[in-house]
């Protein structure tokens, strides 16, 4: 709150001394042999064990990592990258521009924190990135004597456990979160994947912690659903008219059924009351209307293999495992006439917000964090530090152009493309939805402009890397959704690595089959097939020789096509291959790269002279960060580049959150084709965007405040559960439960004034045994409460012991497992029930504000009651089930 | 876990609140420079009326014009005005209802501006009032006094917001609370000195009993509510309906309609309105009626008329104000929007009607209680002839009880969020 403005040092100054020390150490480290370097790791590990302080090891470990990186990958960390590493190690967020080598920066703190032997997790947004980073960066760690692990979706339990045990594990946020939840549903300690959390670096941290904050991770089991109602409700929507029978609220994505609408539906269905608890229709109707009027195909979802697949708004990617909740997904399925899948019931869930707070030390990196600084600080206590770029940024952000309506906007975009393409400057056009990207593609077709299109449609997704690789080429036009955002690296003049790999793959696969068919002298003959080889013949005979060797290599011939592709893809990441054919292939690639380099360099210079990549935004996104992600595609590593947004008064952002008066003025003043280019309007748009961001922030903050309580409860339950899971025997727990149950029962019965024979039968019912059989009811009334409890306890102990003996005789050795499982199962069941109640409660407390009550306080109050109730029910069920259980 | 730990610690918050309250209290006694307090004291000894003025500002019998003399009252007045404006001006009420954080911020800053304006007015009036008391009074000094007092008021406002944000309790209400509490000793003294010897023990006991009843009634009034149970689409959608076995009672879906939606506002408004006749009378406009008013019959019945109108006005303002706080039409629309309904009652007009009726009954009950509680002390005073009893008006009692209830609720909420930390055995 009180910050002295004069005291704020620049980030470079703050870490000046450390950087100097690391640089000073470089010459010493350089003289060490590989073996000595590796030995250093053990020394540092030992030093950590002795001192328990990582800060003393920063300088040495950073210097080591830098040297190891230089020796393995040939990459030496820049000073700014060291700063990035220091920021990450300080548990903060490092904002680094695209192409500044975030992956390499992460190695510094990862190595340092792995010295604790407690494990480091590096979290990426998708599996491709995880495996790419693990393969390339893994070499550094291996060189230094550390193990790396990689988690992939299809891995088995032992594989997962092994990979999580590694010093440094690369994993996607999704897998990690679900593994955490699964760990807390495990019935056996052997099935647990994760070790206690230590340190985590989240890549694209704003995507994970902010954009996805509102979508919780959910493990659910399906329950039987009646699909008829969804279908009928979906059909009813055909007989409803907008603004007569229902109204929609685009801002909140909600619909309102008017009185007329209610009557209409009741008439169609022939029911009295839509809210009838015995035959409820209202949820189905509301969802059907929402599905038909607020959720659109190719905007919010696509239909793939007869299934509804959600398209993520922020990344533009499909989310095959995600489903809308509360019956909305089923309603959309009914609308699209695809098979309706069963509804689900949450058994475990956590939000990313709370999941990542489990880590004692958390840090993250991204290209766009500064605009969300407040949120990171308030919710996650993560300060954001901007890391300076290694080279100055040359990107030019042109002011927005605003058009009268959508039509003139899109036309203007197409015309702009036409003009730009005359000089062959590459263009990347960002659209917000699949639908719009395809609409624009058609428009460009009419203008006879060749283009590539990248969106969530499966046929386009398959070609993603190819499209991206060529997006920087001279004269290329690429239309993309937000998919061309994070992690997309567009190289000016095209990516030769990719082109080379593609060419070589075609050559190798062709020859592989030809040699397999024993056509000995294929090489010379098929020079004709590949013009490339013919050209090469003149420059590099060596290439052909190696190629010839390779295609006669037995090992190589046994590889499948996919494996060839894999080796080719990884060859760039691995510097020193081990197997002979890998060496040969690496050589071939290098040779080809060298051959192509000249043309590529020329292309690169030409494109640079044209002004680099030209980014066209077609609509402002809800968040400035997403726009910046798109802009960040150009101007990487000091390249030139330009970006401009084409907007119209009819855009969603302006329509919903802009100023109505401004809209009218703009509409009346703007001519058909003439855009408005003014700083003022841009500023107004910025403020509208800020408003949306703030609204969303409020939503997330609100979610966080409420979820905080549930999270605390979850921590308690998971802690208790883990203790049971890890314990040799749950005997103590059972005894404790028994005591609690008995005192709860007796005090409750006393309160309700139940006496005599009624008391006996009640207790028998509650505990499910033949307690008190030989106890005259008259005596009961005379007993003091405490004596009565003692008596019951004795009875309980006796029955418990006899039960154990009974089980031990029949099934020796089973009792411990039995007890443990019993507790775990009931804990999980009651937790599941509790989750449902809490979700309803969350909804219910909103109405309390009409009594001038703070909903959050009310939530806390009722949540605590529910939580206590959950504990009581769990204990009762466990004891009841234990005492009743008989051997089957 | 760690980051919420220290932020929400009850002790830290309590200490912060106490510290700031103490600081403001001290600032109240910090003399404004330029005012010769010797002269002031001298003047005040002669002019009793001014004495009451100055002491009411600071809440007790000081003769110091302190830096924080204006205290939180400019803000209170400003927020009352703001509240009325919001409910009366459609533009503002729309802003408050639909806008998110930004709207709240702009309303807040408007309130602060109003506070500034109000403190300027109030400090100017103080400055000119002091003209009579100070020998060396001149315009420059008056200007300085205005600056000092206004600055003081704004600092108090800032500090009170810090309490609300980082401390325990709501800053402004805590400040009013301390002001009321700090006047209690003086009030007791006054009652004792003014009625010493004249009053039998019995009336003392009786008045103590009445006070107890009044407090009990106020708590009941503040906490009492009627729950209107709801059934929501989401609830019906739950596949295994955890509440289906039991009645709605357990579900937590209800609207609490409080007996006293309006708080102390009706009393404040009533008092304000009832000042007007006296004011007019003082202005001399009613001089023609003077012979009539001075008639002995009229003087006797004047008090009765006053209290009856007091009672009726509170009743009316309560009813009026509660519809501002919760508008049945808005509520019904909101229910419809969220696809929630009251069991057995159709959404739309029927729901509006139902809510209107329920609210009318609830508020009427609350309004009668409030009016009774407000007039009760005066009646007691009249019967027992315990003068000074009215000084501790129902408004003060309502505020005291309200603040304490809010405090306990906030403390409970903090405890309930930290209670889970103790469950790791």
Curated annotation (Swiss-Prot), chain A:
It comes from the Eukaryota. It catalyses: ATP + H2O + cellular proteinSide 1 = ADP + phosphate + cellular proteinSide 2. One of its GO terms (molecular function) is protein-exporting ATPase activity. It is found in: Plastid, Chloroplast stroma; Plastid, Chloroplast thylakoid membrane. It is a peripheral membrane protein. ATP binds at residues 81, 99-103, 489. SMART domains: SecA_DEAD (SM00957), SecA_PP_bind (SM00958). It is an enzyme of class 7 (translocase). Keywords: ATP-binding, Chloroplast, Membrane, Nucleotide-binding, Plastid, Protein transport, Thylakoid, Translocase, Translocation, Transport. SUPFAM superfamilies: Helical scaffold and wing domains of SecA, P-loop containing nucleoside triphosphate hydrolases, Pre-protein crosslinking domain of SecA. HAMAP family: SecA. This is Protein translocase subunit SecA.
UniProtKB/Swiss-Prot annotation, chain B:
The keyword Transmembrane helix applies. GO terms for cellular component: chloroplast thylakoid membrane. Its main location: plastid. Disulfide bonds: none annotated. It is found in: Plastid, Chloroplast thylakoid membrane. The chain crosses the membrane at residues 15-35, 62-82, 113-131, 139-159, 168-188, 201-221, 266-286, 304-324, 364-384, 385-405. One of its GO terms (biological process) is protein targeting. The keyword Cell inner membrane does not apply. It is a multi-pass membrane protein. Keywords: Chloroplast, Membrane, Plastid, Protein transport, Thylakoid, Translocation, Transmembrane, Transmembrane helix, Transport. PANTHER family: SECY/SEC61-ALPHA FAMILY MEMBER (PTHR10906). The central subunit of the protein translocation channel SecYE. Consists of two halves formed by TMs 1-5 and 6-10. These two domains form a lateral gate at the front which open onto the bilayer between TMs 2 and 7, and are clamped together by SecE at the back. The channel is closed by both a pore ring composed of hydrophobic SecY resides and a short helix (helix 2A) on the extracellular side of the membrane which forms a plug. Belongs to the SecY/SEC61-alpha family. Component of the plastid Sec protein translocase complex, which is composed of at least SecY, SecE and SecG. This is Protein translocase subunit SecY. It comes from Trieres chinensis (Marine centric diatom). The gene is secY.
């Amino acid at each position: 709150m009180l910050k002295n403005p004069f005291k704020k040092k620049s980030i470079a100054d703050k870490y000046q001394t450390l950087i100097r020390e690391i640089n000073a150490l470089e010459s010493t480290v350089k003289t060490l042999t590989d073996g000595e370097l590796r030995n250093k790791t053990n020394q540092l590990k030992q030093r950590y064990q002795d001192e328990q302080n990582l800060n003393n090891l920063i300088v040495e470990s950073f210097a080591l990592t830098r040297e190891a990186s230089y020796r393995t990958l040939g990459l030496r960390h820049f000073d700014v990258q060291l700063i990035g590493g220091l920021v990450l190690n300080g548990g903060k967020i490092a904002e680094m521009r695209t192409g500044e080598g975030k992956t390499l920066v992460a190695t510094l703190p990862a190595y340092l924190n792995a010295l604790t032997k407690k494990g480091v997790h590096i979290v990426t947004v998708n599996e491709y990135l995880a495996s790419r980073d693990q393969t390339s960066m893994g070499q550094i760690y291996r060189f230094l004597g550390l193990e790396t692990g990689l988690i992939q979706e299809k891995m088995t339990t032992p594989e997962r456990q092994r990979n999580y045990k590694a010093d440094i594990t690369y994993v996607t946020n999704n897998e990690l979160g679900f593994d955490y939840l699964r760990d807390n549903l495990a019935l056996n300690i052997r099935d647990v994947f994760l070790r206690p959390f230590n340190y985590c670096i989240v890549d694209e941290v704003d995507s994970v912690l902010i954009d996805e904050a509102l979508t919780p991770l959910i493990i659910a089991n399906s329950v039987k659903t009646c699909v008829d109602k969804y279908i009928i409700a979906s059909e009813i929507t055909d007989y409803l008219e907008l603004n007569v029978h229902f109204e929609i609220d685009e801002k909140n994505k909600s619909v309102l059924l008017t009185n007329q609408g209610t009557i209409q539906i009741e008439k169609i269905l022939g029911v009295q009351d839509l809210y009838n608890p015995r035959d409820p229709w209202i949820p189905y109707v509301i969802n059907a209307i929402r599905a038909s009027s607020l959720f659109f195909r190719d905007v919010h979802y696509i239909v793939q293999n007869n299934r509804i697949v959600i398209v993520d708004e922020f990344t533009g990617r499909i989310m095959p495992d995600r489903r809308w909740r509360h019956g909305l997904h089923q309603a959309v399925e009914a609308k699209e006439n695809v098979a309706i899948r069963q509804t689900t019931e949450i058994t475990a869930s956590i939000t990313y917000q709370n999941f990542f707070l489990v880590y004692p030390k958390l840090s993250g990196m991204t290209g766009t964090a500064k605009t969300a600084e407040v949120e990171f600080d308030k919710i996650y206590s993560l300060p954001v530090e901007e890391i300076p770029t290694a080279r100055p940024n040359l990107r030019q952000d042109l002011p927005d152009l605003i058009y009268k309506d959508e039509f003139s906007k899109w036309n203007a975009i197409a015309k702009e493309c036409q003009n730009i393409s005359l000089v062959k400057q590459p263009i990347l056009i960002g659209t917000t939805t699949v639908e719009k990207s395809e609409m624009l593609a058609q428009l460009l077709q009419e203008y006879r402009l060749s283009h590539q299109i990248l969106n969530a449609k499966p046929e386009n997704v398959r070609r993603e890397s190819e499209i991206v690789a060529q997006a920087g080429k001279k004269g290329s036009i690429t239309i993309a959704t937000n998919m061309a955002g994070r992690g997309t690296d567009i190289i000016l003049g095209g990516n030769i690595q990719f082109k080379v790999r593609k060419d070589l793959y075609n050559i190798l696969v062709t020859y592989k089959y030809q040699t397999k068919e024993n056509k000995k002298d294929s090489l010379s003959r098929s020079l004709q097939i590949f013009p490339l080889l013919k050209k090469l013949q003149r420059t590099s005979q060596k290439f052909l020789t190696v190629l010839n060797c390779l295609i006669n290599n037995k090992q190589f011939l046994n590889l499948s096509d996919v494996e060839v592709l894999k080796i080719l893809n990884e060859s760039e990441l691995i510097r020193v291959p081990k197997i002979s054919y890998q060496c040969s292939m690496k050589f071939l690639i290098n040779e080809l790269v060298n051959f192509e380099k000249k043309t590529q360099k020329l292309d690169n210079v030409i494109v640079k002279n044209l002004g680099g990549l030209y980014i066209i935004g077609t609509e402002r996104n809800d968040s400035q960060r997403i726009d910046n992600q798109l802009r960040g595609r150009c101007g990487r590593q000091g390249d030139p580049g330009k970006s401009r947004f084409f907007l119209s008064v009819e855009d969603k952002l302006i329509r919903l959150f802009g100023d109505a008066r401004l809209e009218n003025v703009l509409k009346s003043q703007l001519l058909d084709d003439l855009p408005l280019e003014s700083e003022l309007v841009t500023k107004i748009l910025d403020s509208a965007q800020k408003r949306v961001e703030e609204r969303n922030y409020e939503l997330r903050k609100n979610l966080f405040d409420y979820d905080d309580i549930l999270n605390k409860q979850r921590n308690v339950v998971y802690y208790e559960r883990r203790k049971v899971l890890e314990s040799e025997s749950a005997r103590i727990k059972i005894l404790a439960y028994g005591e609690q149950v008995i005192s709860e029962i007796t005090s409750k019965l006393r309160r309700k004034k139940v006496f005599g024979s009624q008391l006996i039968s009640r207790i028998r019912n509650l505990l499910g045994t033949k307690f008190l059989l030989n106890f005259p009811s008259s005596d009961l009334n005379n007993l003091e409460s405490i004596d009565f409890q003692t008596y019951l306890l004795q009875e309980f102990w006796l029955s418990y012991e006899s039960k154990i003996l009974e089980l031990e005789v029949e099934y020796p050795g089973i009792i411990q497992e039995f007890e443990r499982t019993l507790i775990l199962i009931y804990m999980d069941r009651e937790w599941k029930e509790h989750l449902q109640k809490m979700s309803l409660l969350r909804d219910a407390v909103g109405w309390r504000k009409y009594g001038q009550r703070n909903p959050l306080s009310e939530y806390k109050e009722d949540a605590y009651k529910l939580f206590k109730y959950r504990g009581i029910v769990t204990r009762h069920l466990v004891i009841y089930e234990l005492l009743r259980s008989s051997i089957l | 876990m760690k980051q919420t730990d220290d932020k929400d610690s009850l002790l830290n918050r309590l200490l912060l609140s106490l510290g700031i309250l103490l600081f403001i209290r001290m600032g109240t006694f910090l003399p404004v420079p330029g005012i010769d307090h010797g002269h002031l004291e001298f003047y005040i000894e002669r002019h009793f009326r001014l004495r009451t003025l100055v002491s009411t500002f600071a809440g007790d019998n000081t003769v110091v014009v302190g830096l924080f003399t204006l205290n939180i009252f400019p803000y209170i007045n400003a927020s009352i005005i703001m509240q009325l404006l919001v409910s009366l001006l459609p533009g503002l009420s729309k802003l408050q209802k639909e806008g998110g954080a930004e709207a709240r911020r702009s309303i807040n800053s408007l309130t602060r501006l109003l506070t500034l304006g109000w403190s300027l007015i109030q400090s100017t009036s103080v400055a000119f009032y002091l003209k009579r008391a100070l020998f060396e009074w001149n315009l420059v000094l008056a200007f300085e006094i205005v600056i000092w007092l206004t600055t003081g008021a704004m600092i108090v406002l800032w500090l009170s917001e810090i309490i609300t944000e980082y401390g325990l309790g709501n800053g402004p209400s805590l400040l009013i609370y301390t002001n009321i509490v700090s006047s209690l000793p003086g009030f007791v003294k006054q009652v004792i000195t003014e009625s010493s010897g004249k009053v039998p023990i019995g009336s003392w006991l009786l008045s103590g009993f009445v006070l107890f009843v009044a407090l009990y009634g106020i708590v009941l009034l503040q906490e009492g509510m009627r729950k209107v149970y709801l059934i929501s689409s989401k609830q019906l959608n739950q596949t295994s309906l955890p509440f289906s076995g039991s009645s709605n009672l357990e579900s937590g879906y209800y609207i609490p309609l409080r007996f006293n939606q309006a708080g102390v506002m009706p009393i404040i408004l009533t008092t304000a309105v009832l000042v007007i006749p006296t004011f007019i009378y003082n202005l001399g406009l009613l001089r023609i009626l003077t012979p009539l008013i001075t008639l002995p019959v009229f003087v006797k019945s004047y008090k009765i008329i006053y209290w009856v109108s007091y009672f009726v006005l509170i009743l009316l303002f309560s009813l009026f104000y509660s519809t501002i706080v919760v508008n049945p039409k808005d509520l019904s629309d909101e229910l419809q929007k969220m696809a929630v309904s009251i069991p057995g009652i159709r959404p739309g007009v029927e729901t509006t009607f139902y809510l209107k009726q329920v609210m009318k009954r609830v508020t009427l009950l609350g309004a009668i209680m409030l009016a009774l509680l407000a007039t009760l002390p005066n009646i007691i005073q009249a019967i027992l002839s315990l003068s000074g009893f009215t000084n501790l008006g129902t408004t003060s009692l309502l505020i005291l009880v309200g603040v304490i209830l809010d405090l306990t609720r906030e403390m409970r909420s903090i405890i309930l969020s930290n209670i889970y930390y103790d469950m790791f055995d």
